[in-house]
Amino acid sequence: MPRLPNSEDPPERPDFITNIINGLERYNPEAVGTLEQYLTTQCEERFCDCNANRTLLKLYQLNPDRIKDEVITNILVKAMTLFPSPQFSQALHLLSPSALSQQSELSEAVSKLRALNNQLEGAQYARFWATIESDDLYADLTTDIQGFEEMVRLRIAVLVSQAFREVQLSLMEQWLGLDEAPLKTFITEACGFKIEGDIVQIPKNPDNEAKKAEIREDVNVEMFSRVIRRAWEEVA
């Protein structure tokens, strides 16, 4: 089962991006193009650098003439794949309220992405896949993000593995938005789970392992004597 990646300081981040994030270059309008190209790299190579993307959104705040709607939606989609986390909300709060309040393509796109993110955050996975299929605009919004659906499915699988040892195959079908052969291939090959009949067997891990809870309460002699004394007083 793959581990959840480090999205704040990913190992893929090059030194020149670190210099922009941590230095005075983060206020330089000329850094916009560099950060936009870095976002393209993230989309193509399936990793996310939320720190760098927030830096880009802050530069957009300072330089509204440089704003690109497609870049904003790509940042939001990348943040969405990190559910459950505050990354989507943090990116959303860096957007210009005036841009979102207008009846524009960006406003509509952000509204749709917010709805998708809410479904993922609320573990409404079946509803998420149904929503994705309901409007071609969702495909347009996620087309730049290589492996978007696979990343979401892997994230769901990780969360399921943290909570369960056994899951009905029919439930996994709904949660992963797959059926029959593709579903079984993903479960066994991408996730490393086993299928026995209509049950998905999930390997034991520190999160889903049943642990015996031990509750101890220390009672000293003085506390015990007070209880006995109070009982005698009530009788008397």
Curated annotation (Swiss-Prot):
GO BP term, example: formation of cytoplasmic translation initiation complex
UniProtKB keywords: Cytoplasm, Initiation factor, Protein biosynthesis
Gene Ontology CC terms, in alphabetical order: eukaryotic 43S preinitiation complex; eukaryotic 48S preinitiation complex; eukaryotic translation initiation factor 3 complex
Coiled-coil stretches: none
Residues of the PCI domain: 48-218
Subcellular location: Cytoplasm
SUPFAM superfamilies, A to Z: ARM repeat (SSF48371), Winged helix' DNA-binding domain (SSF46785)
GO molecular function: ribosome binding; RNA binding; translation initiation factor activity
HAMAP family reported in the protein's UniProt record: eIF3k
Protein's name in the database: Eukaryotic translation initiation factor 3 subunit K
